[in-house]
Amino acid sequence: MSWIERIKSNIAPTRKASIPEGVWTKCDSCGQVLYRAELERNLEVCPKCDHHMRMSARNRLHSLLDEGTMVELGSELEPKDLLKFRDSKKYKDRIASAQKETGEKDALVVMKGTLHEMPVVAAAFEFSFMGGSMGSVVGARFIRAVEQALEDNCPLICFSASGGARMQEALMSLMQMAKTSAALGKMQERGLPYISVLTDPTMGGVSASFAMLGDLNIAEPKALIGFAGPRVIEQTVREKLPPGFQRSEFLIQKGAIDMIVRRPEMRLKLASVLAKLMNLPAPSPDEPRESVVVPDQEPEA
């Protein structure tokens, strides 16, 4: 036996390090590898480049509303395949797949609660559910949110993240544009504030209806906001679009939105604006709140 073989025989093999899944993630913008817990503390905003990653509807609402005050509305509403629609896959199968993947029944989650002790109703889109597309259930839940705000005489906040109307529901989906817009007219008649927060992306029938009808339209940084996508527009007009076209920074220069607010500052900004609109005392800054993985719970109707 050679001296090299004698040394090798005395070396014990090391155990392969096991790293649990989900501990690290990668920023889609700068490519930086990030510690998942740090990213959650920063509300899914990259601490290196300030890129605002997509956030689940429940985590967004839980990071906005005061703890222990949240009650879900419209959770009993579920989508139905009334048209027996089928493209490359049956619509009912797409619904089942999206429900299994996200744990949600449809693409909009509505809750009532308090924001800095101020009663509010808040809605948020779950983009992972069929691209946050708007169907009959999304419209019905949004109207439920409006009705609850009217009943409680309180403001309504909606966080949009949608690709637009859900093609599998055809005309029933397009009807929601008119229904939701008409419902907001009742908020205006009562003088109750409706704040629309546009997140990445807010497109199609959602941007063409209630997402742009806020008394105040706020956007997150670099959010894609528009009706048709940039690629479709370029192919139609056969011209190169200007840099940053349809991004929130471009839109605020053109007067299409009112302000851009970073996600970690959103809770206090919304509370401050609503306090002014409702003639209430200005809220005090609170401790930074992190995004948490919300466990599955039986929601209250």
Curated annotation (Swiss-Prot):
Residues 280-301 are annotated as: Disordered. HAMAP family: AcetylCoA_CT_beta. GO terms for biological process: fatty acid biosynthetic process; malonyl-CoA biosynthetic process. This is Acetyl-coenzyme A carboxylase carboxyl transferase subunit beta. Pfam families: Carboxyl_trans (PF01039), Zn_ribbon_ACC (PF17848). It is found in: Cytoplasm. It comes from Enterobacter sp. (strain 638). The lineage of its organism: Bacteria, Pseudomonadati, Pseudomonadota, Gammaproteobacteria, Enterobacterales. Its EC number is 2.1.3.15. PROSITE patterns: COA_CT_NTER. The gene is accD.
